[in-house]
């Protein structure tokens, strides 16, 4: 007997993505322009994903702002990091505000490896321990680069009631973060920062950065969030992304060509990354237990407090197992 994924609605009882047809404009889907977005681009190229794909290099914190925005920067859907979405949703609940979106899908099942980096010429920073009491660069408040240093601090035993383990400085995108740790005649703006390992590796190889450690997320790394979980276009979007994932798995050479042709990755790095990542065959729905575990860890790390609530306020489409006897 095998199991397959079935989707039920969160707030309206038994509900899946609607299968009704709608004559609406294209979905606006924000993605972080890294290698993880490859199946989504393949879905648009080969399977008719009817969406405008909008790159957002500032990370998940910026994605949450786009989901809330009603202006030209607004999006209908965002694909981003679990910790960024959960932290933002929890903080909105703690503040008594509506986040303006909910979690509707799970994109990547494997954890994310965050590289911990400093400038290659920084003789004062040689290990993770050297960051205690220092200044950590982040892309944006609420992004994974902001959340994960606190998870690291918890693991390292740096958290205390009276003193922050480090200070944080909002720097901006990946290029700005790299510049912030370089020592070029003046005191660097930051002592270290965290970014996905394979995105960072090119800059170890070219001598710009120095790797001082790494940390894995203790949860599946990427989720899908939607401004309106009842949007009828989400059903076809999910089906198209599922097709894109299948195509990625069946055509690895095309995936490698996309990664190396549009991003700073060597063929060897792309191949190595592909061995480490597992995309879900069906992106629809989120396991509430995964979200509750993430909330628990973020509370322990001091990112969230008891007012943040749990999955019942965050998961808009649940993912459940159902026996399949066929």
Question: What is each stretch, according to the model?
Answer:
Residues 23-169, 191-197, 211-212:
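Short, glycine-/small- and polar/acidic-enriched structural segments
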Residues 82, 173-261:
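Pocket-lining segment of extracytoplasmic ligand-binding domains
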């Amino acid at each position: 007997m095998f199991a397959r994924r079935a989707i039920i609605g969160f707030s309206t009882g038994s509900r899946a993505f609607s299968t009704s047809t709608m004559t609406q404009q294209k979905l606006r889907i924000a993605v972080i322009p890294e290698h993880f977005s490859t199946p989504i681009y393949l879905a648009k190229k080969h399977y008719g994903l009817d969406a405008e794909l909008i790159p957002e290099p500032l990370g998940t914190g910026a994605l949450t702002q786009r989901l809330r925005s009603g202006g030209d920067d607004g999006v209908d859907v965002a694909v981003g990091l679990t910790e960024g979405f959960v932290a933002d949703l929890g903080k909105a609940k703690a503040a008594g505000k509506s986040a303006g979106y909910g979690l509707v899908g799970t994109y990547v099942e494997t954890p994310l490896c965050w590289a911990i980096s400093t400038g290659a010429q920084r003789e004062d920073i040689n290990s993770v321990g050297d960051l205690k009491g220092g200044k950590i660069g982040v892309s944006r408040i609420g992004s994974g680069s902001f959340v994960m240093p606190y998870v690291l601090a918890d693991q390292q035993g740096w958290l205390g009631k009276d003193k922050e383990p480090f200070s944080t400085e909002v720097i901006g995108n990946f290029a700005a973060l790299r510049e912030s740790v370089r020592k070029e005649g003046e005191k660097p703006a930051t002592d270290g920062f965290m970014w996905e390992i394979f995105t960072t590796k090119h800059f170890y190889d070219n001598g710009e950065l120095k790797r001082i450690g790494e940390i894995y997320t203790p949860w599946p790394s990427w989720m899908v969030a939607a401004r309106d979980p009842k949007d009828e276009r989400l059903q076809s979007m999910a089906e198209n992304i599922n097709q894109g994932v299948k195509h990625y798995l069946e055509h690895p050479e095309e995936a490698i060509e996309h990664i190396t042709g549009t991003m700073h990755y060597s063929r060897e790095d792309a191949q190595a990354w592909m061995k480490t990542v597992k995309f879900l065959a069906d992106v629809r729905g989120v396991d509430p237990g995964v979200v509750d575990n993430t909330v628990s860890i973020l509370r322990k790390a001091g990112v969230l407090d008891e007012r943040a609530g749990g999955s019942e306020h965050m998961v808009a489409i649940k993912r459940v197992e159902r026996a399949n006897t066929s």
